[in-house]
Amino acid sequence: MVFSNNDEGRINKKLPKELLLRIFSFLDIVTLCRCAQISKAWNILALDGSNWQRIDLFNFQTDVEGRVVENISKRCGGFLRKLSLRGCIGVGDSSLKTFAQNCRNIEHLNLNGCTKITDSTCYSLSRFCSKLKHLDLTSCVSITNSSLKGISEGCRNLEYLNLSWCDQITKDGIEALVRGCRGLKALLLRGCTQLEDEALKHIQNYCHELVSLNLQSCSRITDEGVVQICRGCHRLQALCLSGCSNLTDASLTALGLNCPRLQILEAARCSHLTDAGFTLLARNCHELEKMDLEECILITDSTLIQLSIHCPKLQALSLSHCELITDDGILHLSNSTCGHERLRVLELDNCLLITDVALEHLENCRGLERLELYDCQQVTRAGIKRMRAQLPHVKVHAYFAPVTPPTAVTGSGQRLCRCCVIL
């Protein structure tokens, strides 16, 4: 479209409303609000509900009160598909009831840290928001099993649910949830400390589409529960068991035999796991990309050898506090396909047997981006310097204890702390 110099009309008169709305749809909230102040015509365009399909209020969390959410819901109505109220501690049940009534097409709702909300909010969502697919209730500590019963009855399209740190949830709530929401693909239950193996049995029975499960710090879970999950959820790709300190190699065996698509395994602080379990896992789960084995204190270089042979896609590996790992294990890892092509992050802090020789081996890992070496007492500054000469892009985090100075005979000058070194 070409305009002559004599044209007096402004852009809002030259372009059709549909095209102007399309242009405005690319603007963020702040820019839309600024545009709304330009003129009456732009105010109408900027505040058109079709431009407010996705709203994230995290950056304004301290200023967001209930009335803000209510006004947004009235403005957006059925247009709104995605809303994040993460950290908006001033928002409560009453406002979210109004929101649910006005925004019945909402699909993605983040209420992480909205500590004022109770079961009442979940009842409202259940009643009015049947299209909800993604719901984050992290740290909504007043949520109980009643919420899960309501969600299961009214939000049957739910695919993602985060209940982390909702520590009133028990197996009864999980049973009610999964009976109604059988299409769940991701369920995050970090810090739900009352959950026991029976809860996992219910998940196994109904959630055959499950891809991601987080059980971090669910300390009552045992091998029996993990075995149940593995038998029913063969599509599992991401599993977090960190802090489930009762687990043994039986859990790894179940994963290896039943979950060949596994890509992410977090098993930090599972101190009973051994090389035998990880050997079977590695030989069957060739898609593994990320593993957190921090404080798996019984594993040795044998685990690294098996991962090197069978897991060519490995990108991130944490071996922090695995004190039996040596330079030889790092040699096998560095010479493997994953070492040459995929490895990006390696955490070796508090691996006391690691020396500068391991750093020489890691020079083969051309894609390495981050290396953690805190409290590796046999690693030297010189060794790190030599490695970084070959891998200049890698970020190395290391700690060197300061040399104890001799006792001053006279006077005492101010000293600088030079303990922590980020290289």
Curated annotation (Swiss-Prot):
Renumbered to this chain, region (Interaction with Calmodulin) spans 80-90
Q: Name one GO cellular component term.
A: cytoplasm
Please give the InterPro entries that the UniProt record associates with this protein.
F-box_dom, F-box_LRR-repeat, Leu-rich_rpt, Leu-rich_rpt_Cys-con_subtyp, LRR_dom_sf
Query: F-box domain: from which residue to which, for each copy?
Result: 9-55
The topology of this chain with respect to the membrane is:
Lipid-anchor
Query: In the UniProt entry, what is the domain comment?
Result: The CAAX motif is a signal for the geranylgeranylation of FBXL2 and is required for its association with cell membranes and the recruitment of substrates to the active SCF(FBXL2) complex.
Q: What is this protein called?
A: F-box/LRR-repeat protein 2
